């Protein structure tokens, strides 16, 4: 079953898992244990739609009217594609801000959604920022809950947590660079959470802009049927507006900030292009929508309402993305995107959200009802330290949340009072008395973790929702405060871990060092800098360390006995079975005949397996891709205990692992480098020098882009080397790609270094 096709509440969970098989990633990423479902889970939007229609029949007219005016959307893209600039225009045109400020503007104010000092200094988005605004269309007022997300891969958890709670998204693509590495990553994240999207091709005013090449890349690289619903009027510096090819209307942005839209006839020189792209749009829709397909086969041209209805059906059904174009920086083409959000992205009651009813002790999938009269269910998806304490962002899926009311934390069972309820506008907040189903809000003073579920205080159903996907850290470094006062240092570490699940902290008893791990060098650099600015703690950091993995390449059997006698009752446990290599996550299973190992001891065996995964036998790094199966064993009537079998499993794991031709895996990164054409030889030479494998080279009018795979171990200091060989004009992005077996020489060096540390 494709993970991306699961209903929203269960989308990252795996159905029909045997209770004797443990996948380590489930325990790591989600709060609850393995789920087991007997119900058939919808695999397509058509199947979901049947359930959605049944739910909507139970909603009141007030609920339906409220939902129809609401859109929960995110803005996502590759770094430097113009997300925050686009969002700034959205806020200005919807009246939420009175003036436009640029991301790297000279006024030292910065974009509204980049409220952190570090974001404004570096010109990048580090944290997702939420706001809400209103937009008028066809004499109706619509409310948008909008989240601007980072484009840098190091802050990917911000994209994950935003997409987890949003109903739709605007995917921003650069008209010059087209689909880039992080565009592919964002597309994968949108599929993971079943998020429909409209696409905005930005930077149409730049030299080399080619929107139709970008659309072709969306079709080929993202494997998403896409077609333009606009064509540009003019190109590059001569960009004047866009033509809506559905209605055959030209739209010009006028006024000092492009705030006025003037509709006019299609320019004569664009008439043929408009008809060509309109025919292509209808042809593409015929491939994904039955109604248009029938008209197409009968030779009939669909009407404008039929085309718009088909685009909406196909977009919400995740079969198609309509493509708009313009330039946010030049204030052109942004307002039509807001119209497209209303026309083509779903309202809350058009998305199937599900949870797990755990009231009876047996987990059962339940559909959430976007009604304000139903019992409250909400998901805490983001935490921030505010001036009034911890700020918790909550998406309300069912019922309503009132100021002064109580709700229950599903994980701890604690009753929590909602003392203050706010709507966020970046770092500003506006108090509200209540929020209804489908809305996003924030509250203070709640002790919880990101991804926790809350329900109404008097709710009969105990409903839990799945958390967001949390990727593994790929880089680590040692850290210690310069001063001996560890109070603020510990406080910062605890807070950052709570806010960001990809930021990990552990104490290494061997080196007696605190180790922080994250998604990349920039990720960790930002936290070190934040400790200095927000807590006054200057830190000393060690050299970045790669997060290797240990794996096996051959199957083997094991027969291990743990025996310990020290007077009185001792310890005894014997386990037998086999260990085999496995693609992907680790797995533990057992099949014991005749009760040779009691159930409670088998549970201890699974715990012993989990313990063993944390520190592999070769160099003490996590283990990946191992299946351990226990099929026999032996107990002692007096000396056997859970500890005995946990220890026996740990010993058997080590014994078998070392006999199974173990190897060390290193993280391989997908690298994308862009630079002026005259530096192509230097960049290719640099990548070859690092032992990278070049996958693709795309030559543009002025710039080229190289995509390659390189070992993370060789990438430290790459930014300095790239600046040197491109005179500071080169840019690059890094994204984790896969784990691959490292060179034998490096493996020997790593093992020798680990053994040397062990002897100290």
UniProtKB/Swiss-Prot annotation:
Residue sites binding GTP per the record: 77-84, 148-152, 202-205
Location(s), subcellular: Mitochondrion
Protein's pathway: Protein biosynthesis; polypeptide chain elongation
Domain of life: Eukaryota
GO biological process: mitochondrial translational elongation
Database matches in CDD domains: EF-G, EFG_III, EFG_mtEFG1_IV, mtEFG1_II_like
One cellular component (GO) term of this entry: mitochondrion
Molecular function terms from GO: GTP binding; GTPase activity; translation elongation factor activity
Domain tr-type G: 68-349
SMART domains, sorted: EFG_C (SM00838), EFG_IV (SM00889)
Entry keyword annotation includes GTP-binding: yes
Feature: transit peptide: 1-37
Pfam family, one: GTP_EFTU
UniProt KW keywords: Elongation factor, GTP-binding, Mitochondrion, Nucleotide-binding, Protein biosynthesis, Transit peptide
Sequence similarity: Belongs to the TRAFAC class translation factor GTPase superfamily. Classic translation factor GTPase family. EF-G/EF-2 subfamily.
Function, in words: Mitochondrial GTPase that catalyzes the GTP-dependent ribosomal translocation step during translation elongation. During this step, the ribosome changes from the pre-translocational (PRE) to the post-translocational (POST) state as the newly formed A-site-bound peptidyl-tRNA and P-site-bound deacylated tRNA move to the P and E sites, respectively. Catalyzes the coordinated movement of the two tRNA molecules, the mRNA and conformational changes in the ribosome.
Protein name as catalogued: Elongation factor G, mitochondrial
Annotated organism of origin: Meyerozyma guilliermondii (strain ATCC 6260 / CBS 566 / DSM 6381 / JCM 1539 / NBRC 10279 / NRRL Y-324)
